[in-house]
Amino acid sequence: MSDTREMLASMAPDELRSAMRTLGYRTQNDLAQAIGVSRSAVSLWLEGKVGVPRPVAMLLRMLVAAQRRVY
C-alpha cells in the first residue's frame, strides 16, 4: 500500500475528535449511534487503542468535506 493510501486510510484520535465536532456529535454515543457501532468502539478509537476502520475514516472525511462546502 502506498504512503498516500495509508495516510488516507488511517485516522488519528485528534482527527476523529475534530470530525465529531465539525459534524455536531457531542458524545461518543452520538457518533456511535449515527454510524452504527458501539460506544465502546468509539472510545477505543479516541483513546488510540484501536485504529479507526478504513470505511469509517473515509465516511467521516467525506461528511466533513460536505459539511464544509455547505458553509
Question: Residues of each region from the PLM?
Answer:
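Alpha-helix N-cap/helix-initiation sites
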Residues: A9, Q28, V52-P53
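DNA major-groove recognition helix of helix-turn-helix/homeodomain DNA-binding modules
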Residues: R54-Y71
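A short, Lys/Arg-rich alpha-helix, primarily the initiator
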Residues: M1-G24, R61
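Short alpha-helical "recognition helix" segments of helix-turn-helix
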Residues: D30-A32
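Helix-turn-helix DNA-binding elements, focusing on the entry/boundary residues of the two helices
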Residues: T27-Q28, R39
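Recognition helix of helix-turn-helix/homeodomain-like DNA-binding domains
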Residues: G36-G51
